[in-house]
Swiss-Prot record:
Function: Involved in autophagy. Thought to act in autophagosome and omegasome formation.
Name listed for the protein in its UniProt record: Ectopic P granules protein 3
Membrane-topology descriptor: Multi-pass membrane protein
An annotated GO BP: Golgi organization
Gene Ontology CC: cytoplasm; endomembrane system; endoplasmic reticulum; membrane
Compartment(s) where it occurs, according to its Swiss-Prot or TrEMBL record: Membrane; Cytoplasm
Organism encoding this protein: Caenorhabditis elegans
Length: 458
């Protein structure tokens, strides 16, 4: 008996050990799942946005052109009905336009003043429009300072030192510049040139401030409503904000992106002085000024006042001064001499630029009836071609933007129709359920008053 008890205790003390198979070298703690795994399905809004990004002229011109024309027609109809909704304003505007047209065409001594006012209004409106286009860009990145305002300031500066005067004959100034017949006895100074081009520069700067208003109102409305608008710059702004909150943001973001994120996070705390500071300095850290201030619900006058003062007054005087100093007396020739010292390509760069400057000087001294030289250098031809391509690309960006807006309009209309259809189906389904309620007489046993229960016998 003792032997049997001993054997039974030995059997009961036996344990089973499970050994794991040896892991291969450089293996992870967890095995990778087999198969492709599960991927999240994009929403209809995401698919719609991805499709809209493909609607560009160089990919789908047969869709872009009709969509752009339809969007223009829709905008015209909407504007017409909005004008009709304000009948008093419409009546006063029509009367004012009628009086202005009558005064414009009526003969009299006032015609001289009318022509002067018209000339100034068109000239000033042109620079404001260029500033707005430079700020908005519509996705093209068009910076009209490099195309129009910068060359205008440079031409006035070079003409001032060449002619030794700023009293350019009008006309043809400001369309073209010619030296006056008599030279001034007073030397041309830096501040005189600044005063000559100040109006155009300030109007251009005011236009850039006005161009920040649409993104400001868009971002402000999106923040208040909680809906994300279909805007590429706003999505870029939100991605930068969300990426900065992650734990490994310092590794993912570059130094410029981290600096831009810091500015956009703290601009609403700095308020008017901070917005004025960043709007006054030409820097890439504040390129989304309207979106940033609108997203953080900065008050309108704090945003627009600081942006207007910073861009139109401070920043424009900085850019003006830089261009005037760069193209002032003999600085252009010194720059050409520096270019000539570049190995291999220096002499080839110097000659076209020297020819262009010499041709510009000769054009300044021609008389109004004199025939000018029509030959064009390769450098001038290349610059004209570059400007033409930039303007053409800007025009195509406007067409693409209109086509995308019409595609979004179609999507919104389709979504509203689907929502109305679903609401109608749900309503009809609820009505059918109410009609299909079972009457009490269809089940007399369970619903009768004398029914007390069921007795189950074993």
């Amino acid at each position: 008996m003792a032997k049997k008890q001993k054997k039974s205790t030995e059997k009961s003390e036996r344990t089973v050990e499970f050994k794991e198979p040896p892991k291969p070298a450089n293996s992870e703690e967890r095995l990778k799942p087999a198969g492709r795994g599960m991927k999240p399905s994009p929403s209809q809004n995401t698919l719609n946005r991805m499709e809209r990004e493909t609607i560009v002229f160089w990919r789908r011109p047969h869709i872009v052109i009709p969509y752009a024309l339809m969007e223009i027609a829709h905008l015209a109809v909407e504007l017409f009905f909005k004008i009709l909704a304000h009948k008093t304003v419409l009546l006063l505007t029509a009367i004012s336009i009628g009086l202005a047209v009558y005064g414009y065409h009526a003969p009299g001594a006032h015609q001289e003043h009318v022509q002067t006012i018209e000339k100034h209004i068109l000239w000033w409106s042109w620079w404001v429009l260029l500033g707005v286009l430079s700020s908005i860009g519509l996705g093209s990145g068009l910076h009209t300072f490099l195309i129009y305002l910068g060359p205008h300031i440079a031409a006035v500066t070079m003409a001032a030192y060449e002619c030794q005067s700023l009293d350019f004959p009008q006309p043809p100034y400001p369309e073209s510049i010619q030296c006056p017949s008599t030279k001034s006895s007073i030397a041309v100074t830096f501040w005189q040139i600044v005063a000559k081009v100040r109006v155009e520069s300030l109007l251009w700067g005011a236009g850039t401030a006005l161009g920040e208003l649409p993104p400001y109102f868009m971002a402000r409305a999106a923040r208040i409503s909680g809906q994300e608008p279909d805007d590429e710059e706003y999505r870029e702004f939100l991605e930068l904000m969300n990426a900065d909150k992650e734990s490994d943001a310092d590794q993912k973001l570059s130094i410029v992106e981290r600096a831009k994120s810091w500015v956009e996070h703290n601009i609403h705390r700095l308020g008017f002085p901070g917005i004025l500071l960043f709007a006054s300095i030409p820097n890439p850290l504040f390129d989304l000024a309207g979106i940033t201030c609108g997203h953080f619900l900065v008050p309108f006058w704090s945003f627009f006042g600081a942006t207007l003062i910073g861009k139109a007054l401070v920043k424009m005087h900085v850019q003006m001064g830089f261009v005037i100093l760069a193209f002032s007396d003999h600085h252009a020739e010194n720059f050409v001499k520096i270019l000539e010292k570049i190995p291999a390509v220096g002499p080839y760069i110097r000659q076209p630029i020297s020819d262009l400057l010499e041709k510009q000087r000769k054009a300044l001294h021609k008389t109004p009836g004199e025939h000018s030289e029509q030959s064009t250098s390769y450098l001038a031809w290349g610059l004209s071609l570059m400007v033409t391509f930039m303007i053409l690309f800007f025009f195509l960006s406007i067409v693409n933007s209109l086509a995308k807006d019409y595609h979004k309009r179609l999507w919104e209309r389709k979504r509203r129709q689907n929502k109305d259809l679903i609401d109608e189906e749900n309503q009809s389904f609820e009505e059918e359920e109410e009609e299909a309620v079972t009457p009490p007489s269809s089940c007399p046993l369970l619903l009768s008053d004398g029914f007390e229960g069921v007795v189950v016998k074993k």
